[in-house]
Every structure is written in structure tokens, then in C-alpha cells.
């Protein structure tokens, strides 16, 4: 008997949600007098179906995440050689997704162009590759969605959509002002995510120090409550330095004018 093949078949069936046990496969093999190679071939087929389903899940997660697909931001594509510090390994190890599984939030704080959004997107993409639902949006977009939801009576739907993903990324906090009602909604989202079960991570990026966020959220008590819940268990990366942007820019100096003298005829 080829027990490993039966185990692989049962494992693949479980992952693709087919009710078919290794005992059933063994019984079928006996009834039809299947040779060992046939059982291995069946295991290969189920393994392929499992891989195909996994890829479909990943593709769907990426599609719904709003992360870039043409030029994806990945950890492999990030220049870690430009980042220095005593605890750099805390940053380089993010690809393990340990914050997601330990239910720890992430914040990337620093000036423009140091890689905050790239790192947040890279983490989100890793979540997608692990089959975890991820959603990316800018703080300005969230603010607009809140205002729209209030206008058309879709607040419950909006909050549920923000709580549902395992990983929610809000980029560029401090680029817009949330009015009193939207600040309350912001608190509601953070509060519900803080008690959400299962793998869970919320990511903020910002050019502003968190102590200055009160300038961008009108309702101070709700903001304080949201920040208290978010930073209760979070990894905060304060990144200093010059912008990465413009590294590929080439400056070419040219001069306009006639290259040959103009001959005057009278």
C-alpha cells in the first residue's frame, strides 16, 4: 500500500473542500485493483487541483485588495541596504507575517519618499499570497467613503467592509481632515478591528508624528480612543532620512537657439 499517496490525496481533498478520505481512496484502489503508479497519478492530479485553487485564491485576494498589480510592491523589491538601525531585523522579518498572526498592528512614520507605502504594500501583498483578505486605501479615500456612506445610508456596509479584511492598510494619515462624524466612524472601525477574531493587522502610514494627528481628526475623544486601541499592541517604525524618489531621474542640460549664424542679406 502506498500510504503517503493516500495521505496526500486526503490532504489535497480537504484543502479543495472535497469530502473524500484516505480510507475511501484505499477502498476504491482495492475494488478496482489499482497499481501503485495509478494511485500516485491520482495524488498528482489532486495536488494540481489544490495548487490551482490556491493560486485562484491568491489572485482573487490581490484583485480585491486594490494593491498595484502591474508594478507590485514587494519586500524583494525594497532596498533594505538604505535602512540602518539597531533593530533593522524587526523590519526585514516582516515578510514572515508574524504581526498578522500575533494580531499586532503596524505603523510606518517618516518623511516623504523613505519607503513607508512600499513596505505597507509589500506586507499586504504577502498577506494576499497567504490567502488572507487585504484592503488598501488612502486616508483621503476613507474620508470620502465615509462621507458618501453617510449621505446614502451605507454606513453599516462601509464599516463591515473595513473590518472584514485580515489586513487593512490606511495610507497617508494626515493628508486630510476627518470631521466629527467621520472621526467617530474611524474610531468605530478601529474598535471593531481590535476585537476581531483570527489573524488581524491594521497598518497606518503617515508623514506626521502620531502626537500631531489630533490636527486632522476633529473629535478628539474618538481619536484618542482609536489611537489607544491601535497602539495598544503595535510595531511603530520611525523612519528618518532622505527620499528614495528621483533615483532614476536623469538631468540633461540643453541650450535653445540657432546653431549656425544667420547671414543677413540686403
Specify the residue positions occupied by each region the protein language model found:
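Walker A/P-loop nucleotide-binding motif
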Residues: 103-119
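Residue-level preference for the first positions of well-ordered beta-strands
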Residues: 105-107, 167, 201
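Post-Walker A helix-loop "phosphate-sensing" segment adjacent to the P-loop in P-loop NTPases
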Residues: 125-137
